[in-house]
């Protein structure tokens, strides 16, 4: 088993034990986002300024290692066309739970971000990658893919 498989299993167990980054947003948070009241985190302590994103409606967004039902549902509520890629099965399940509850089908891809990404070049307008770089040995190949 390689280190990314071990990491995925570790994250799965954290999520099953109530890890804060594996707790999906509430219905109320989703509804607020639909009405323009929203915030997402890239790091644990500060909400990303809205102006970093620009207009979200119709924007194609990849949530890279962004499962958990926290950011991608917000972007979806804002009208973005979202795909989430994560190696944690439990994190992807949380995305699916939010989608089912809110009436949409999330595009979830289980893949290792240290490998070539399963998308054509320039498939996305924006890549959202919350803190996950600390779990991989070499960042350069990931950045080349992005």
Please identify what each model-predicted range represents:
Residues 1-31:
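N-terminal, positively charged/glycine-rich alpha-helical extensions of SAM-dependent methyltransferases
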Residues 54, 59-116:
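Class I SAM-dependent methyltransferase SAM/SAH-binding core
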Residues 24-59:
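Conserved alpha-helix/loop element of class I SAM-dependent methyltransferases that forms part
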Residues 125-140:
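A short SAM/SAH-binding and catalytic strip from SAM-dependent methyltransferases
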Residues 140-146:
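A short glycine-rich, Lys/Arg-flanked "PGG" loop and its adjoining helix->strand segment in the class I
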């Amino acid at each position: 088993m390689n280190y990314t498989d071990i990491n995925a299993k570790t994250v799965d167990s954290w999520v099953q034990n109530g890890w804060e980054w594996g707790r999906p947003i509430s219905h109320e948070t989703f509804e607020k986002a639909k009405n323009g009241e929203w915030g997402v985190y890239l790091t644990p302590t500060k909400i990303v300024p809205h102006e970093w994103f620009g207009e979200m409606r119709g924007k194609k967004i990849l949530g890279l290692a962004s499962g958990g039902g926290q950011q991608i549902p917000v972007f979806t509520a804002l009208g973005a066309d979202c795909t989430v890629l994560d190696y944690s099965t439990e994190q992807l399940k949380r995305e699916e739970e939010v989608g089912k509850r809110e009436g949409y089908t999330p595009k979830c891809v289980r893949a290792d971000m240290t490998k070539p990404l399963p998308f054509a070049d320039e498939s996305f307008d924006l890549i959202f990658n919350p803190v996950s770089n600390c779990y991989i040995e070499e960042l350069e190949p990931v950045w080349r893919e992005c």
